[in-house]
Every structure is written in structure tokens, then in C-alpha cells.
Amino acid sequence: MANYFNTLNLREQLDQLGRCRFMDREEFTTEAEYLEGKKIVIVGCGAQGLNQGLNMRDSGLDVSYALRQAAIDEKRQSFKNADENGFVVGSYETLIPQADLVINLTPDKQHTNVVETVMPLMKEGAALGYSHGFNVVEEGMQLRADLTVVMVAPKCPGSEVREEYKRGFGVPTLIAVHPENDPKGEGWDIAKAWAAGTGGHRAGCLESSFVAEVKSDLMGEQTILCGMLQAGSIVSYEKMIADGIEPGYAGKLLQYGWETITEALKFGGVTHMMDRLSNPAKVKAFELSEELKDLMRPLYNKHMDDIISGHFSSTMMADWANDDVNLLGWREETGETAFENYPASDVEISEQEYFDNGILMVAMVRAGVELAFEAMTASGIIDESAYYESLHELPLIANTVARKRLYEMNVVISDTAEYGNYLFANVATPLLREKFMPSVATDVIGRGLGGTSNQVDNAKLIEVNEAIRNHPVEYIGEELRSYMSDMKRIAVGG
């Protein structure tokens, strides 16, 4: 199979990369009706599989789960997830032939094998759904011409898909139709109904493409979403311990600080996050973030280049074929880092203290968000896609670190994201350790500026504020957050 993106000419590549349109709520007036009375079979029952299925069932759709016979016989977790929630569970051979829509929600690594197994069982004219387009775009999966192929990609972990639905809302969602596979012209009807069934239409759906979703998703998760959190945690912990800060405090500041700091992003972008700092701390964080951007821009651009060219995917798939030897080795190395093993502490840290003593963390977040956004948009990905795959998802990933440190982050994210995270962090960590961290002290990570006067130069502060607020990620972020707020008010009646 050939990389699908690389078979396109330049004009087609740019067209597919640039697909992203925020859809009006009026486009979903029929909600999930198009799929009512049709049989939906989900393959795989992990976090996304189970929670999307629960939402669709609650939306009045007919949902069942097809699992490998061995998973059923051995009553594996996927079987328990579906069975204990009252779903019909059957083998591929039993359920796939009657399905109108087969949704593949297995891990990326399994997609080729799963699709090659289920495709011969699918009836003529059925539809095949994905929540991540890696198999189509990077592996170049050859799909039957009679199949309609669509994507619905919620921009958050599966557990949040369910929780937001239960609140009467949903999560922002990218939807797409594979241009090579829409023989009956019903792809968008199917995708919109599926998205509505999960509740995504209440938070806002973006009309995207398989290509735009894959390339932006890979870039975001490798760099700011996962790689930067991992590298930043490791080097910041090392700095604090070397300078005499108590290990329990240092670890807790990082583990819970990323979540607290990025929560500010969710409400008001980089501008609001920076506004949580005192004026001297804001100026310091800005200066540090500018240094970080200069230092790390080549690394961000390299990752974007390798994603666009397909080099990243081919490298990772070679590791798949080698029994994940690199992935498993990097996972073990991460588990042995000092940050992952810091002693538990009952020290209390107030919300504001995370900002005051985590100035460097704020700087890393600003630098990482802007670098990822800039690398994506410079490659033809439009602002909306770049925003969702950088700033928007960061608080969700930071929440996983808060739960069980880097281990939890790497367990929750996809196998593809985990591999890319290690590729980035394995270069970023020594780069920061050697070229950046020697010049910083615990006034920006661990202890704060203390009794420093709040006095700043007015002209300098104005310059800093304008630079922060005038970055393109802030403009598109304000627009998209206002859309989501408007939709939430409509959805919950308030």
C-alpha cells in the first residue's frame, strides 16, 4: 500500500490540507435521523468505542459491537465493556454482514488487519467509519469502491465524549468524507448523523478532510500536546532537585501545574494564561518563551516536515513490524526518569502558586502552542485545524499527567501519539538540558520571584501584551471559543 497523501499532486495536497470549516448548527437540524433504523456495528470497545457507542444508543441509534472470537471467548476487557453495558456483542462473521455502518475504533496499529478482515464481510454499499484517518492517509488502505468512507473525530479522550454528552453538551468534532469513497453521495449525511449521535454537533463540528485531520493530529500530539509536556517535566524536575527544592514539592508542582496552567488556556487562550502572572513574571515568561521558540523552532519544523513527507509514518510502521522494540524501550526509559518516581507529598499548593512558581512552565506552554500552530499553518493546514490540534487539546492531555504522571498520558493517548511523543521528547530533552536550562534558576521554576517589586517598564509591558494578543492563534481561538460558548448556551438552554 502506498501513502495516499503522497499519491496526490501538489494542488490536491494543498486543497486537502486546507479543509476545515466551522459548521452552522442549522446544518444538523435532523440530528441523527439519517442513521435511525440502520444497523451500526462498532469494531473495538476501548475508551472511544464504548463511549461513542453509549452516546449513539442514547441518541436512539441501533448499536452493537463486533469483536474477535478470542476476545469474546476469553471475556477480555473489550467484551466486558460492551456486555456489561447491555450491548449485543458478536463475532465479525455474525454482525458485520448485516451492518449499514461499520465503525472501526480499534488502535491505529490494528487498522490494516481489522479492515482487511471486515471488508470482505461488509454488504454492498455499506459505509465504513474511522475516528482517525491514519490507515487511509498514511498506510494508503485500498478500500472497496462501493463503500462510503467517513470520519468522525472527537477532539478529546473517549471518557470526555461521554461526560459532556451526559451534561447535555458534547465535544468539538472533526468530520470528513474520503473523496475516493462516496459512491452514492451520502457521505456527509452519514458523517453528520454519526457526529450528532455522539453529541458533537452541540459543541461544534468542523468540516475537514482525512488528510487535514491526520497531518494536524500527528503534529499536535508529537510536539506541544505530549512531547513538550514530557520534556518540560523531565528537565524542570531535574533543575529544581539540583537547586535544592524538596522532591515532593517539585514533582507536585509539575504534575498538577500543567493542568492548572493550561486550564486558563481553555477560558481565554494564551492571553488569559499570561494574565494570571504578575507583570514582572509575565515579562519574564514572555522573554523565556521567545528564547524557547528560537531554540526549538527547527525541531518543530522537522517534525512537521517528516509528517508531511510520510517519513514519520514509515519509521513508526517499521517499528510496528519489529514488535515495537523502540516504542517499548522508550516507554521503559520514561518510567525510570526521576520525575516519574518522585516521592508522594501532602504539601498543599494553591492555584495561584502554580502560576507564581511555574513561570517557566507558562513560558513552555506559550512557546509550544505558538510553534506548533506556526509550523502547521506554514505547511498549508488552516488556522481552525491548527488551533484544535494545539491549544484546544492541551488541557485535556495535561489532565492525564495530573492523574498518574507521564505514564498515564502515554497510556491514554494512541500508540501513534506515544511513538511520536518519544521521538520529539528524546531530542527536546537533551536540547533543553544542554542549551537552555543552565541559564535559568528557581526564580522561574520552583520558588518564584518572591519579594521582587511589581514595577515594570510601561513601554515593555505594552510591547509584551501586544505580542501575546496579536498572535494568530489568539484571533482564531477567540472566534472558535465564542462559537462553542454560543452553542453550549443553546444546547443547555441557558
From Swiss-Prot:
Its EC number is 1.1.1.86. NADP(+) binds at residues 45-48, 68, 76, 78, 108-110, 158. InterPro entries: 6-PGluconate_DH-like_C_sf, 6PGD_dom2, KARI, KARI_C, KARI_N, NAD(P)-bd_dom_sf. It catalyses: (2R)-2,3-dihydroxy-3-methylbutanoate + NADP(+) = (2S)-2-acetolactate + NADPH + H(+); (2R,3R)-2,3-dihydroxy-3-methylpentanoate + NADP(+) = (S)-2-ethyl-2-hydroxy-3-oxobutanoate + NADPH + H(+). Pfam families: KARI_C, KARI_N. Substrate binds at residue 414. PROSITE patterns: KARI_C, KARI_N. It is an enzyme of class 1 (oxidoreductase). Transmembrane segments: none annotated. Pathway: Amino-acid biosynthesis; L-isoleucine biosynthesis; L-isoleucine from 2-oxobutanoate: step 2/4; Amino-acid biosynthesis; L-valine biosynthesis; L-valine from pyruvate: step 2/4. Residues 14-208 form the KARI N-terminal Rossmann domain. Residues 209-344, 345-487 form the KARI C-terminal knotted domain. Keywords: Amino-acid biosynthesis, Branched-chain amino acid biosynthesis, Magnesium, Metal-binding, NADP, Oxidoreductase, Repeat. Its cofactor is Mg(2+). One of its GO terms (molecular function) is magnesium ion binding. The active site is at residue 132. PANTHER family: KETOL-ACID REDUCTOISOMERASE, MITOCHONDRIAL. HAMAP family: IlvC. Involved in the biosynthesis of branched-chain amino acids (BCAA). Catalyzes an alkyl-migration followed by a ketol-acid reduction of (S)-2-acetolactate (S2AL) to yield (R)-2,3-dihydroxy-isovalerate. In the isomerase reaction, S2AL is rearranged via a Mg-dependent methyl migration to produce 3-hydroxy-3-methyl-2-ketobutyrate (HMKB). In the reductase reaction, this 2-ketoacid undergoes a metal-dependent reduction by NADPH to yield (R)-2,3-dihydroxy-isovalerate. Belongs to the ketol-acid reductoisomerase family. This is Ketol-acid reductoisomerase (NADP(+)). It comes from Vibrio atlanticus (strain LGP32). The gene is ilvC.
